[in-house]
């Protein structure tokens, strides 16, 4: 069954600005600017008032209506990223082949050695410009 109209709104806090043009959302806050492209989803996005964004779908089926809340959640995560930021803690865990992880180029590249017993070295470039990587040497059990 198709509903005539389904919508949801996202409230933006003070200090966070946003622009929407052709389903491309730009969010700017104290920690930087994020951009997300939602052109693959066929729905309307419009500014309502100064600090609200409405996501609307006309005559949507169940999957399209579920995508409305998904878009709003992505935008809320963008707001969280430009206000508070994110921190990721990662550990290398192995069962048989001991993995060796080293930092190269001043923390811009991570080299993974002996991954699944491979002889090659896997360099992983970190594309984030505001990324801070710390190598924790103490073993945790």
Swiss-Prot record:
GO molecular function: rRNA binding; structural constituent of ribosome
Any one cellular-component term (Gene Ontology): cytosolic large ribosomal subunit
Name of the molecule in the record: Large ribosomal subunit protein uL6
Domain of life: Eukaryota
GO BP, one annotated term: cytoplasmic translation
Keyword Ribonucleoprotein: yes
Sections of the chain in a coiled coil: none
UniProt keyword annotations, A-Z: Ribonucleoprotein, Ribosomal protein
Family statement drawn from the similarity comment of this UniProt entry: Belongs to the universal ribosomal protein uL6 family.
């Amino acid at each position: 069954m198709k509903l005539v109209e389904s919508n949801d709104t996202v409230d933006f806090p003070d200090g966070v600005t946003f622009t929407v043009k052709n389903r491309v959302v730009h969010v700017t806050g104290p920690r930087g600017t994020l951009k997300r492209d939602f052109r693959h989803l066929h729905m309307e996005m419009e500014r309502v008032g100064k600090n609200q964004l409405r996501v609307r779908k006309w005559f949507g089926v169940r999957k399209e209506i579920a995508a409305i809340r998904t878009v709003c959640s992505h935008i809320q995560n963008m707001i969280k990223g430009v206000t508070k930021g994110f921190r990721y803690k990662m550990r290398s865990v192995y069962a048989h082949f001991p993995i060796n992880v080293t930092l190269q180029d001043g923390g811009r590249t991570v080299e993974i050695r002996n991954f699944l017993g491979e002889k090659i070295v896997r360099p992983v470039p970190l594309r984030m410009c505001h990324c801070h990587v710390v190598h924790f040497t103490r073993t945790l059990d």
